[in-house]
């Protein structure tokens, strides 16, 4: 396969933005489910306890091993092919849940304009979202990056306008009450952490396209440094201003247009239209950017001989068109299935894969101390291990608290374990029919 380096810093910042966030969408359900005070506290805590350690570790790994396949390559270098396959498999399973959500999100905001869409029409819209994003991806990484910039600016401008319009109407503390009435504190904390974590995960996703990034050893860490504050500020500023100027108890999933009507006074109606359009744009851009990232996992595994060779082929643009098309076909099938109750399982599978990546940095630092890129965390091995332990503790807390909520927690944990448990037998099948790895994984 021959790839083409076309992503510079700014497009990569917005690809990361849509790999992780896409705007404050779903924050409204976090506030409604757990209460504004707890929601705001969680939105401050997760970036410090999860995202900051993750971005630092991902930045060093991406700088150290700037290869197509990203985290799959890091785990392969540290732990070998078995654990690399598990990492890729877990990623693929949670991507099926993840990618089924965005067409649903698109339909939610489309419902603001067309509230009576039937099931067949919604599924048709979902397919249009999937294959519209696929058409952009087939043109290569550069069009995905450029479209991400345009979509990101449109979404961020909408929420900036809402913030400015809501400020004159702020009439109460946005963090009151701390907990939603009638909620069990531990159950609310577990659910809130899971929802918030889902809104902050994915900083490693775009590492899979590093073979298509210009000067990736420097560009990926630099893009992370811009994207993290952009995402965090977007969540906090929007939630604070809207909660201070509206009744949080009436918030609901997909409810930003209604929040704009309640919080923005005379500007409520035009802002509601803007945010409904922004929700649709964000959903399409999320699918678009994540298809770019997720499709490179079968590409990397195929280049190692663990999947059919045709998935590693690239076209004249340097695009792995077969991997993109096969990924889109799977996501189209799973768009028929409702995964609304499996967001916690999605988070757990991602976290399991991420912990393997953290372990990769620790092992590579110890085993190959001379292996380094343009960026390195300015800490010794012990401090880096402690840094990686912080999000690991957050994960254990979430698992423990999730068990307090039998409606969501226990089924999600069982689903995550079942999905992960399929990895070893699938690896055995893959190695039984393994092909010779491709020798050339170069980029132009």
Each model region followed by its residue ranges:
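Helix-loop-helix junctions that connect adjacent transmembrane segments
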Residues: 4-5, 40-41, 120-121, 150-273
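Transmembrane alpha-helical segments of multi-pass small-molecule transport proteins
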Residues: 9-17, 43-44, 113-141, 156-162, ...
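A generic transmembrane alpha-helix motif of multi-pass inner-membrane proteins
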Residues: 33, 345, 349-350, 381-444
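C-terminal membrane-solvent junction of multi-pass transporters and transport-like membrane proteins
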Residues: 147, 183, 310-319, 354-408
């Amino acid at each position: 396969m021959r790839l083409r380096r076309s992503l510079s810093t700014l497009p990569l910042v917005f690809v990361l933005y849509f790999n992780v966030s896409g705007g404050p969408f779903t924050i409204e359900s976090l506030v409604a489910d757990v209460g504004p005070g707890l929601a705001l506290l969680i939105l401050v805590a997760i970036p410090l306890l999860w995202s900051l350690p993750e971005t630092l570790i991902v930045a060093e790994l991406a700088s150290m091993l700037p290869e197509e396949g990203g985290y799959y390559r890091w785990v392969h270098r540290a732990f070998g092919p078995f654990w690399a396959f598990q990492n890729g498999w877990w990623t693929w399973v949670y991507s099926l849940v993840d990618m089924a959500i965005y067409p649903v999100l698109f339909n939610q905001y489309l419902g603001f304009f067309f509230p009576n869409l039937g099931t067949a029409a919604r599924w048709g819209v979902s397919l249009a979202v999937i294959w519209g994003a696929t058409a952009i991806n087939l043109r290569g990484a550069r069009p995905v990056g450029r479209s991400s910039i345009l979509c990101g600016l449109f979404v961020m401008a909408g929420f900036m306008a809402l913030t400015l319009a809501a400020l004159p109407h702020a009439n109460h503390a946005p963090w009151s009450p701390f907990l939603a009435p009638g909620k069990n504190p531990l159950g609310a904390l577990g659910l809130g952490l899971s929802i918030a974590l889902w809104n902050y995960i994915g900083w490693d996703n775009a590492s899979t396209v590093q073979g298509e990034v210009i000067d990736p050893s420097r560009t990926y860490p630099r893009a992370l440094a811009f994207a993290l504050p952009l995402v965090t500020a977007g969540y906090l500023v929007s939630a604070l201003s809207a909660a201070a100027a509206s009744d949080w108890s009436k918030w609901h999933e997909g409810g930003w247009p209604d929040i704009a009507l309640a919080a923005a006074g005379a500007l409520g109606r035009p802002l509601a239209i803007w945010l409904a359009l922004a929700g649709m744009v964000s959903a399409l851009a999320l699918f678009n950017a994540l298809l770019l990232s997720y499709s490179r996992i079968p590409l990397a595994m195929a280049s190692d001989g663990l999947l059919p060779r045709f998935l590693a082929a690239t076209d004249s643009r340097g695009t792995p068109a077969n991997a993109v098309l096969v990924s889109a076909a799977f996501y189209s099938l799973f768009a028929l299935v409702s995964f609304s109750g499996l967001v916690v399982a999605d988070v757990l599978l991602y976290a399991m894969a991420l912990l393997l990546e953290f372990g990769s940095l620790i092992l590579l630092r110890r085993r190959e101390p001379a292996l380094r890129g343009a960026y390195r965390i300015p800490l010794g091995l012990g401090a880096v291990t402690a840094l990686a332990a912080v999000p690991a503790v957050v994960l254990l807390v979430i698992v423990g608290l999730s068990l307090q909520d039998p409606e969501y927690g226990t089924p999600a944990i069982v689903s995550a374990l079942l999905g992960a448990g399929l990895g070893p037998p699938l690896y055995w099948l893959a190695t039984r029919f393994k092909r010779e790895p491709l020798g050339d994984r170069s980029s132009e």
